[in-house]
A protein has these predicted regions:
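Membrane-interface interhelical loops and short amphipathic "cap" helices
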Residues: 1-5, 31-41, 64-98, 150-179, ...
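Extended, highly charged clamp/arch subdomains and adjacent linkers
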Residues: 1-89, 98-113, 117-131, 140-151
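Contiguous transmembrane helix-bundle modules in multi-pass membrane proteins
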Residues: 1-30, 36, 50, 57, ...
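Conserved, charged catalytic cores of large soluble enzymes
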Residues: 19-35, 155-157, 187-210, 233, ...
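Membrane-interface helix-boundary motifs at transmembrane edges
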Residues: 31-43, 118-130, 202-213, 272-280, ...
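Transmembrane-helix bundle segments that line or gate the permeation/cavity pathway
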Residues: 55-84, 91-116, 146-154, 261, ...
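Carboxylate/His-rich catalytic cores and anion/metal-binding grooves
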Residues: 123-158, 190-226
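Soluble non-transmembrane domains of integral membrane proteins
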Residues: 530-621
Length: 662
């Protein structure tokens, strides 16, 4: 049933692509047949819903095959076995190339159906073109699923009694939600991309498509960011090397579209308010989708080495052709409609909020280009010089850290700038508090013993950002308090709820500050390694870890070598750490490291078991990782900010906005 549903879905998507294009084109002339146009559009809409239904059937069939351990399917055999828990059997759905493509195709069909349901009445002129773009994308993925990478291929020969099993590294709770979260971000951003192209193809220069798809942009950006953080956390607790970000090509593949999507999300505000940055916005969303497909190409082509990639496959060529086609189509549409995209207003001052947003676009684009260059450099060097030169973390840090510091200053200053006007009394009135907090932040970092320049600057600029957010909240709250005699704390809550988009954005900035602080702790990491016997100790900083014992713990599907250490801080016992090495059935050559962490707001005490001996000796890697918990907490704050920003507005909006309308 699953294979049949996939095949029918492919032909339905091709049909939907064709009739959507015909319906969009049929309304171009004054003599167009209105009833024929309506019929074509209605037919394309039915194809969208049918495509979603068929892909749901196919996905349910594959999921059922995993849950019942149907090893007659090659894909189920390769990624599951009978000892695998049902939770990880679900994870196995997207553990391999075929299943992850099916998950992508299903999510794309779901988003297309939801977008059609939500927007077909609000954007009737654009919907046929958007349907054409979405169904064209769906056709591409269904082409791969049916003819290149089929998830329902039969096992060659007699059905085996058991499967090979899931990769041990993927048997982690984070892997249950990390890939789907990333995919929601990737696929969700297809919607604003489709409507942007629709606006170009339909000749619409207004910003209604931005207004209608804003929630898609914000929510997809959030899920993509959460997916990146979940991936970092998985690397931190599962890989055992002590860090969370290695500038691996697949890590970079998710970061690049997040950077350009961040620029797009901010830049569209200027188009909505001032009728500016139209070419910027079209280019940013086109490049965002291009980078999404480029990242998929990296993951599936095997051309660029990565510990996260699926390995070499024939899919790489298909994605290479597809990503350049969508890039050429998008850029050609921008060039074709360039006169329509002329700005309605122009920058009136180099020191205004509009100029700050322009600089924001440039900075995020520069960051994305740097990551793109570093990721592709090994391939480019091999093509041009015959030698594959790998770019390490040092390159990314040297180039990106200064750019990121400039970005932090911009985030801190931008809310204080006025629209259109040059620097005036507003800035000089509002800037002293953020500057004072910035100085206190730098002094506090230095007084705490930090001597790393970048870390001190991050602490300083983080305080600057918090100061500017505090000023904005205070000014809005005091205006409401004076107007309605409401107590200041309650006024602050009311003003945030009355302008949720704006103040939700400020809460997101607070979350980003926490993430910046967490990242700033990376240069301060301390590490010690050693091999000790039971009752011996290793020391690092003001911690002492006493090795208690080693146990061999067999379970149904694995053997765990478990060690137990007692941790002391300045002579006081603070807890136990239990790092492990695990050996899974059928995967004995792929042992996993299960680290143990004692965490607080200041630092993580991180221990990995790197080796062991039958006589009880054990080798450990012990690290003090400062401020890591700030990363994860920052993600929660960003979630609150996004929730506030996208929550439906009240009908009666109370304005206590500091900046006013332009």
């Amino acid at each position: 049933m699953g294979a049949a549903a996939l095949l029918v879905a492919f032909f339905v998507s091709l049909y939907g692509t064709g009739v959507a294009l015909a319906g969009a084109l049929s309304g171009r002339g004054p003599e167009g047949d209105l009833s024929r146009r309506r019929g074509l559009i209605k037919s394309s809409e039915l194809a969208v819903y049918l495509n979603f239904g068929l892909l749901t059937i196919a996905s349910a069939a594959l999921l059922r095959a995993f849950l019942v351990r149907d090893f007659s399917l090659l894909y189920v055999f390769e990624y599951s076995n009978r000892s695998l828990s049902d939770a990880y059997a679900v994870t196995a759905f997207w553990a391999g190339q075929e299943g992850s493509l099916l998950l992508w195709a299903w999510m794309l069909a779901a988003c297309a159906a939801l977008a059609l349901f939500l927007h077909h009445k609000r954007l009737p002129d654009l919907m046929p073109w958007a349907t054409f773009v979405l169904m064209l994308n769906s056709s591409f993925f269904l082409l791969l699923l049916n003819f290149v990478s089929h998830p329902f291929s039969a096992f060659p020969g007699a059905t085996p009694a058991d499967g090979y099993g899931l990769n041990p590294l993927l048997q982690n709770p984070g892997m249950i939600i990390h890939p789907p979260t990333l995919f929601i971000g990737y696929v969700g951003l297809t919607i604003p991309y489709a409507f942007a192209l629709a606006a170009l193809l339909a000749g619409r220069s207004d910003s209604e498509w931005i207004t209608q798809t804003r929630i898609w942009t914000v929510v997809s950006w959030f899920f993509l960011g959460v997916g990146i953080l979940l991936g970092a956390e998985w690397a931190y607790v599962e890989l055992g090397w002590g860090g969370y970000w290695a500038w691996d090509p697949v890590e970079n593949a998710s970061l690049m579209p997040w950077l350009t999507a961040t620029a797009f999300m901010h830049s569209i505000m200027i188009q909505q308010r001032r009728g500016m940055f139209k070419i910027w916005n079209m280019s940013l969303i086109i490049f965002t989708y291009f980078l999404i497909i480029f990242g998929t190409f990296i993951t599936r082509s095997g051309l660029i080495s990565s510990v996260h990639a699926f390995g070499k496959s024939s899919l790489g060529t298909f994605f290479l052709v597809f990503m350049f086609l969508i890039l050429l189509l998008g850029l050609a549409a921008v060039v074709w409609r360039r006169k329509m995209l002329v700005a309605q207003n122009h920058l009136q001052s180099p020191v205004s909020r509009e100029s700050a947003f322009l600089l924001n676009n440039i900075i995020f684009s520069a960051l994305a280009f740097t990551v793109f260059w570093g990721t592709t450099f090994p391939v480019l060097s091999e093509i041009t010089k015959g030698v594959k030169i790998t770019v390490g973390a040092g390159f990314y840090n040297r180039v990106n850290v200064p750019i990121a510091l400039v970005l932090m200053v911009l985030i801190g200053v931008c809310p204080l700038l006025a629209w259109r006007s040059p620097v005036g009394r507003k800035v000089f009135r509002d800037l002293p508090l953020p500057l004072a907090l910035s100085a206190i932040g730098a002094a506090g970092a230095y007084a705490s013993g930090i001597r790393n320049t970048a870390t001190i600057l991050v602490m300083s600029f983080s305080a600057l950002i918090l100061g500017s957010v505090l000023v904005e909240f205070y000014r809005g709250a005091t205006a409401l308090r004076d107007l309605s005699k409401t107590p200041l704390p309650l006024a602050a809550i009311k003003v945030a709820l009355s302008n949720r988009r704006r103040y939700g954005g400020y809460v997101v900035h607070i979350g980003m500050v926490l993430i910046f602080i967490g990242l700033a702790g990376a240069p301060l990491t301390r590490e010690v390694t050693g091999t000790i016997r039971p009752n011996e100790s290793l020391s690092i900083g003001n911690y002492t870890l006493k090795y208690m014992n080693m146990k061999w713990v067999p379970t149904q599907d694995r053997l765990a070598v478990t060690t137990r250490l007692k941790a002391f801080q300045e002579g006081k016992a603070i807890g136990y750490l239990v790092p492990e090495r695990r050996f899974y059935e059928n995967r004995e050559d792929q042992p996993t490291s299960e680290v143990s962490i004692l965490s607080n707001w200041r630092e993580d005490l991180y221990v990995a078991l790197t080796g062991y001996n039958r006589d009880g000796r054990a080798s450990f890697r012990i690290l003090i990782n400062p401020l890591v918990s700030w990363l994860w907490f920052g993600g929660y704050i960003i979630g609150l900010g996004v929730l506030l920003a996208v929550w439906p507005r009240r009908r009666k909006v109370m304005s206590a906005s500091a900046g006013g309308k332009p």
